[in-house]
Regions:
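Generic beta-strand hydrophobic packing signal
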Residues: 85-87
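HotDog/MaoC-like acyl-thioester-processing domains
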Residues: 1-11, 89-144
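Hot-dog-fold acyl-thioester-processing enzymes
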Residues: 1-83
């Protein structure tokens, strides 16, 4: 992913974050650090769970594609994050399931005097069939 300038952030312009396919090992390692529930870290517990197998922690898909897709494009423009809202987990994400992500600025409020802008980013993550698995909004203060 190439670095993009703040000027390229336009309301309703969608940016592709790429695709992530998590392995069972990815799910277990992430969960051990961030969400150590049995059905994320123990094979037998995962198979006996509601999900009948390993599923990613709710935050893992966002964190993965944010790190590999969004930060390389826009990280250099960030002053700080301000809010995270409306995080919805619609479908479980299993190991070996490819998930694609996009980020779309849904609101941009520039302050020329202070040389910053508040941007509300809408994130969508979909499975290979195009079904939403997760959505959220993140409000970020950007340098302009």
């Amino acid at each position: 992913m190439e670095k993009l300038s703040f000027k390229e952030i336009q309301q309703n312009k969608t940016f592709d974050l790429g695709i992530v396919t998590l392995t069972e090992e990815d799910i277990i390692n992430y969960a051990k650090l961030n969400d150590p529930l049995d059905f994320h870290i123990d094979r037998k517990a995962a198979e006996l769970s509601f999900f009948k197998g390993f599923v990613a922690s709710g935050s893992q898909i966002f964190n993965s594609l944010y790190k590999t897709g969004w930060i390389p494009m826009f990280g250099h423009t960030v002053i700080c994050g301000l809010e995270l809202n409306h995080w919805k987990f619609m479908r479980p994400v299993y190991a070996a399931q490819p998930i694609s992500g996009t980020a779309t600025p849904i609101s941009i409020k520039e302050n020329e005097e202070k040389k910053h802008a508040v941007v509300i980013w809408g994130y969508e993550f979909k499975d290979a069939k195009g079904m939403l698995v997760q959505t959220l909004e993140v409000t970020v203060l950007h340098k302009i």
